[in-house]
Amino acid sequence: DGHRIPISVRTSTLTDTSGSVIGGIELFTDISHQAVSQLRIQELEKMALIDKLTQLPNRHYLEKELLNKFEEKKRLNFPFGILFIDIDHFKKFNDTYGHDVGDRVLACVARTFTANSRPFDIYGRWGGEEFIGILHIATGDDMEHLADRLRMLVENSYIMHEGNRLIVTVSIGATILRDDDTIESLLKRADSLLYKSKQAGRNRYSFGP
């Protein structure tokens, strides 16, 4: 009837008394249940690593990726940097317009990251209104350029609420991995630079090598 099902195929050869191949046997096995189970496992794995609201990698995924990046740096000397990003006045969106609008703000920022990220960079939700970008990058100038570009892209995005355009901005701390860094020291430095941006008035980035 044209219905398709997943199968596994096992093939064996048939030989005569002299050892010559005279044919073959194929054994087909319905593996529908196995396929469904595998899809369920993949979905559960995805749910464990993806933030449901923003559809970005979650904190667990980001922590695993940072470990991978540190290993790559040790083995292959691949440089990278991180952006620590915080949505400005996010509490105000929640308190003034409600949590539904706050969720839309988070989703809007996430879409901006997704639409403008390079294939080899990763942006994820660290928690609350905080995000992290893990960027394959070698120089401070490149890092500053990307940080400011991302800031401007978010600033130029908005959501509509009851006929009003709500502008969203972010503050960013940007830094590049040092030879003596640990994951903790790298994140702490980026977080300190983020705080510097917020203290300086928000909607800006601060870079520190």
For each of these PLM feature ranges, what is it?
Residues 9-11, 28:
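Sensory-domain boundary capping and coupling elements
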Residues 44-64, 85-99, 107:
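Conserved nucleotide-binding and Mg2+-coordinating catalytic segments in signaling enzymes
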Residues 45-46, 59-79, 110-118, 136:
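Short regulatory alpha-helical coupling segments
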